[in-house]
Structure formats: C-alpha cells, structure tokens
Amino acid sequence: MKNRNRMIVNGIVTSLICCSSLSALAASPPTEVKIVRDEYGMPHIYADDTYRLFYGYGYVVAQDRLFQMEMARRSTQGTVSEVLGKAFVSFDKDIRQNYWPDSIRAQIASLSAEDKSILQGYADGMNAWIDKVNASPDKLLPQQFSTFGFKPKHWEPFDVAMIFVGTMANRFSDSTSEIDNLALLTAVKDKYGNDEGMAVFNQLKWLVNPSAPTTIAARESSYPLKFDLQNTQTAALLVPRYDQPAPMLDRPAKGTDGALLAVTAIKNRETIAAQFANGANGLAGYPTTSNMWVIGKNKAQDAKAIMVNGPQFGWYAPAYTYGIGLHGAGYDVTGNTPFAYPGLVFGHNGTISWGSTAGFGDDVDIFAEKLSAEKPGYYQHNGEWVKMLSRKETIAVKDGQPETFTVWRTLDGNVIKTDTRTQTAYAKARAWAGKEVASLLAWTHQMKAKNWPEWTQQAAKQALTINWYYADVNGNIGYVHTGAYPDRQPGHDPRLPVPDGKWDWKGLLSFDLNPKVYNPQSGYIANWNNSPQKDYPASDLFAFLWGGADRVTEIDTILDKQPRFTADQAWDVIRQTSLRDLLRLFLPALKDATANLAENDPRRQLVDKLASWDGENLVNDDGKTYQQPGSAILNAWLTSMLKRTVVAAVPAPFGKWYSASGYETTQDGPTGSLNISVGAKILYEALQGDKSPIPQAVDLFGGKPEQEVILAALDDAWQTLSKRYGNDVTGWKTPAMALTFRANNFFGVPQAAAKEARHQAEYQNRGTENDMIVFSPTSGNRPVLAWDVVAPGQSGFIAPDGKADKHYDDQLKMYESFGRKSLWLTPQDVDEHKESQEVLQVQR
C-alpha cells in the first residue's frame, strides 16, 4: 500500500499488480522517470538522462525529508530567523559570516551543461513535489510545517550545492582553533615565560607524534615534508598577543536536547566553559568521529574484498543519511549519503565500492590582518593599505524587525574575528575555497569509476580534508587522504595565526603528496580518524591530538588477531568496538601504583575490579545499568587525575579545556564517539615517561611521584563512588549511557518536532549508519552483496494528522541489535523486493 506522500504526480500510476518488469526499462519513453521503492521505503530511480535521473532523486527526497531538508537549507544559509524568530539571529549571522555566496554561484555558473543538469534536475524534482504539497496541504504537507507555522519554498541549484557546503565542507573541513591556540599560548607564556611557555604549549598541542598509530603503516611510507617546531615559529612571534575570551567560548551553546539555547554572550561563554569542564560532546564539541575497515583479497574469507564503514555524524530523527539507488545515464549505484547529497558518500556500483571518514588534515589557516586606525575597512597587505571586500546582509526575523550587518573579506578570506584592542582582523583562509562545488561533483562522478585509476582521478578533485576508501570486485583495496592543503612559507607554525603579506601561501601542495596506499601489505585498511601516515601533521585544533593513545588500536587489534575474516566476522567488529572501553591505556599504571597495597584497600579493590574486566560494556537485563562498573571507575579516577595534573599545569581559564574525562556528555546521550579526551591523551604521554616522544616541559605530577598522584586520584574516585553506590564494589550497578536520535540537527536547529526524537537504552560507539559491501562472495552467484542500516529509518514524513510514515523508524530495532538490511542493485533484485512504484513523465 502506498503512503499518502508517495501518490503519483505529473505522471502515471503503475500498481504493483500490473507493473511490468524493470528489465523492460530500455524500452521506456525518453521522458520517463521510474521510481521503485523496496520493503524499507528506499527508492531506486530509473531514467535515461542525467537531468531526469536527478529530477527523480530530488522528487523522492522531497517526499521523504521535505522539512528536514528545508531546515538544512536554512541552517546552511542563515535564514532560520525568518521562520523561527529572533532567537536564531545570532546563529544566522555566524552562518552568513562564514561563506561567500557569490563564489558558490560563480562555481555553479562555470559548470558544464551536464553537471548543471545534476543540480538543476535535483532542484526541479523537489519543486515538482513541493507544488503538489502546496496544492494539497491537507493531505501532503508534513505536519512539522504546520507546527512551526510556515510553508515550503522552491529550490534552485544554489540551494542544492549549499546543503553540501554547509554540512560537509563547513562542518568537517573548516575546523580551526588557531585564535584559541593563540589565547592559550598568551596565557601559558604569561605563566611560564616566553621560552618555557612555548615548550609547554608544544607539550599540550604537539604537531607530530611519532608514536601515533597510522592508517598507512610506516613500512609502506611516511610523509615526506618534515616539521621542526624549533624552526616553524618565526611568524607566530610577529602576531599580537590575544587577551580576549577564546573564540570557542562564543560558539552557540546547546541544551541537553541539542537545541540552541539563544542566551546572552556572557551566559553563552559560561555555559560553553562549563560544558568543556563536564564533558563537551565530541572533541571539545567538534564533530567526531568515524571509522572504517577494508579487508582485501589476502585477508578476506569467502570473498575477495569486504568494506565496512561507520561514519559518526551524530544521531538524529529523521536519519542523518538518505538511502538511494540511481540507475541510468551512466550511473548504476546503491547506497546512502548525508542530507541526500547528489553524490553517494557510501555505496557501490557493482564493480567498486567507496566510503569516507573525516580526514582532519590542516587545510585552514588564520591570517592576522593589521587594520587601519584612520581608514575603516582597510587592512595592511605587503606594506600597502587595501580595502576589504564587503557585503551587506539583512536577516528577516519572524515577528520582529529585520537586522542588517556587514560581512568583511580580505584577500585571505572572510573575517571571522576582530580584536579592537590590537587593531587586528582575523581572516580565515581555506585551501578548498572556490572548490566546493567541484568537491561535491567529485563524489558524484566517482560513482561512475570502474577501477583505482579512474577513482583516484576524482579523489584528486575532492578538495575537502576527507579520507576516501576503495575496494573492487577483484579484491583490490585502497585509501587516499583527500583534500587540498596549503604550501606554507618557511617559519609558518600552522597551529597559530600568521601576519599578512610575505606569509601568504606559496600555493597548494601537489596531490602526489597526499597520503595514499593501494593493496597494503597488512591486507587491510583501518581508520578511526587517526593519523593517515607517519610524520603527517595533525589539525590545528587544540582538542585534536594524534598520539600514542588512539581508539583505532581497538580495530587494529581485532583485525590482527586472525589471518582471515568472513563478512559476518567483519560486521561483528562493529559490535566489539562499539562497546569497548579504553581500559588498556591506563590499567598498567593503575596496577603498578596499587601492587603493594593490601587487598582490602579500597583503591586496590577498584583496580582489581578493573583488572578482572574485559573492557566490554554490557547492559543488565533492566536495560538501565551496566554489568560492570569499570567505566564509572575510570571516569571518576580520570576526572580527578586530570584535575591534579594537566588542569593544574594550565593557567585559568584554559584548564577547563583539559578537565573532561571523555566519558561524559552534556546532552541526553553522546553526539559522536566518546573518544579519548584531549586531557587524557596528554596525561597518557606523561605516564609513558621516557618512552613518550613528546618532551615534558612541565612536570604534570607537580614534583610528586606519579604513583602518589595516581593513588590520590583513586582515593577521590572511591570517595565519590562509594557514597553513590555503597562500599561493596561487587554490587555496584552504574547507569548505562543512553542514545538519543535528536529532533534538532547538528546546528541545534529543529529539523523535526520535539516529539519525533527517538531513544535507545544503550549507547553504541559506532556509525550513524553502518554499511558493508562484499565483493565476489563465494556463496551465491552475485558479484557483490551489500547491506546497511540507516536508523531511525528512510522516511521523515509526518502526515498532517500526525501519523508517521511506516518507514520513519522501522530500522531502529535493527540498529540496536546490530542488524542490517540488504541494498539492492540489479533490476531483478529491486523488482523482487519492491513495495511501491511510480512513473513520472518529465518534460524539459
């Protein structure tokens, strides 16, 4: 039975009973767009030309996710206030200040006719359904529009592109904390002096750590460009000190439900600071993380290659990704993709498969531009005063007066911060600027690739810092750390802002330097947003460190344990890693510190309890508590340990950046991976002593023996936990971490009504979606088998009467139990599993 939002418009209704086989598609009229949905509501689009293929794509997206996409459009362009009111004015200003619309429009205008038809077809398809919705709102208007009091508007190619720019480029390739780092360095130098202060800064924010596990093994290759911290700080010494509140404190604060709080600037800073101290979501609130393992022909069993992807975007209702099959005009693909991009980020075409994780390469720099005191809007560049580019922006406000402001831009990029005390404007330079649309289309065009050379041609065009992964029907596997990266001047410390002029980039580094590997000796590729290659420099984010403590080791350890893996075993790695505590990192030090204590000493009891635990967090039958209190013990100990070490060494207020244990969250469930916190990584290096390659400029243990500090923190943990759970450690039942699929998108903007949030009792540290592609399986006669799980479900449609589409959350239980559903590719398979069918006649 068809859902009401899937009624046929502009075309022919073809019932399941009388429809013809999809194998007859070749004989269909050239104007025809055929839409077939499988048993989970996932659509497959069939058309003979690119425009109509993507017309069908946009059409089904509007059917399934119209309100989610509308709010994504407004979130990425800064027009939320127009429909939700003055609480979002500050948010809209921040968004508009961070992009340049004319650049995106110029990129679209320069596209070939074929590429333009991708974006135009998609927009026209959405508009076709929107017209029907507006004509019959009593039947087709998603209830969320009525709840929030506005109607959907037409889309254009710019809107389609901006969804990608705002949710991929600006979310995963635009993170920088160079100004925050400068604020930290200023405070550290004030406490320790210039030379020692810089050494302490290097201890807190190293650039390269030789002990960091890498996706490309050291025996395969290492990064050829070397960084010597002693010779890369010339420019940093020329930048004025920074005494204002760190910019990260001005990021919009969110409540427990992930919604923007819209509070005063002072209250916002207080809230953000408290959230950092208590466990900000992700790496200090930055998006994190994603994992991947690809098993090649020398390690796969009963198959030639196995790819398992787990991108961790956060958990949302409707789902963050959208499942789609595209067939025709040179495309024959199936998979899913964030925000229904017109290019699948996760999928396969029967011959190759692909997937992604965030790369966290450093593709953004901040330039400290000296402002003119006499000529407003002018800045100094190469000794001359240059007028900034500017544009006036007016924000329409529901039930309020419009607000107008100016966005400024230098030769380096948009001005994101101004320090009036030092007459300095901080401009953001992006290596991918001007390449946003080309990057989107690289994902689209890779869907046609049939081998490694063709696929890497598209990887070279993808300018964002994203890890790309490859497998093919012959069992070959590969990896590329894609992105465009600056060729910086000698003396440029990429962690800190640099002055203008002579510190301008020399250009972009050659793609030949991007880390990549094809058929590695290990037989597999694994990544959890760790370093791609030995000696590769990390992001400038103060909260992002590649070091000896890394979660990717959990994947590597499992894959190294046995010579070969079946598809089911590869899938089970999701379960094993998602429930695993990082006990292994600190247990040796804890055991050493308590070895000579009496067995009845509470501190010894805590460590003995940890030592008897395998590190896997399993939930009791009550669905609310863990079978073992291990994570609670480590959380309490690490929280105290960090306060006694890293936090104590860092001047206020910056100590709060390092106080979170990594176990807690400030929202009703995590927004990404509960990873090793930045403070824990710094502490881990200190506990390694001489084995750590990171110089310890300041003794984090304050001159005391480290075991004494460990025992004191254990005593704190005992005092905290025994008051809460009693004196019998064996009887402790600690609360399990829950998981929420939020009704607010990652910006904190509603993408659904609050009642649409879904909940899962047990948090699993795994992908927002998980997919697996298996090439040349020995069972059956198919050259490829594929599965995914996209929770809560394919649809986001809530009917005007409040009834949710049956595919809104029909993958929720599947996700919770580590299940998966098949992804169909061939016409025969799609035909056998179809639930509904539509045929449109599309004139152009």
UniProtKB/Swiss-Prot annotation:
- Gene Ontology CC: one annotated term: periplasmic space
What range does the record give for the signal peptide?
1-26
- What is the designated name of this protein? Penicillin G acylase
- High-level lineage: Bacteria, Pseudomonadati, Pseudomonadota, Gammaproteobacteria, Enterobacterales
The record's catalysed reaction(s) read: a penicillin + H2O = 6-aminopenicillanate + a carboxylate
According to its UniProt entry, one GO biological process term is: antibiotic biosynthetic process
Any single Pfam family the record assigns to this protein: Penicil_amidase
User: Main EC class of this protein?
Assistant: hydrolase
**Cofactor detail note:** Binds 1 Ca(2+) ion per subunit.
SUPFAM superfamilies membership = N-terminal nucleophile aminohydrolases (Ntn hydrolases) (SSF56235)
Q: Which UniProt keywords apply?
A: Antibiotic resistance, Calcium, Hydrolase, Metal-binding, Periplasm, Signal, Zymogen
State the oligomer form and interacting partners.
Heterodimer of an alpha subunit and a beta subunit processed from the same precursor.
- Known EC number(s)? 3.5.1.11
Q: Name one GO molecular function term.
A: penicillin amidase activity
Name its cellular compartments: Periplasm
Q: Which organism is it from?
A: Kluyvera cryocrescens (Kluyvera citrophila)
- Which amino acids does the record list as binding Ca(2+)? 178, 362, 364-365, 494, 540
InterPro entries recorded: Ntn_hydrolases_N (IPR029055), Pen/GL7ACA/AHL_acylase (IPR014395), Penicillin_amidase_A-knob (IPR043147), Penicillin_amidase_dom1 (IPR023343), Penicillin_amidase_N_B-knob (IPR043146), PGA_C (IPR033813), S45 (IPR002692)
Annotated CDD domains? Ntn_PGA
Which Gene3D superfamilies does UniProt cross-reference here? 1.10.1400.10, 1.10.287.150, 2.30.120.10, Glutamine Phosphoribosylpyrophosphate, subunit 1, domain 1, Penicillin Amidohydrolase, domain 1
Task: List the active-site residues.
Answer: 290
Q: Which cofactor does it need?
A: Ca(2+)
Primary location group = periplasm
Protein family according to the UniProt entry: Belongs to the peptidase S45 family.
Source species, domain of life: Bacteria
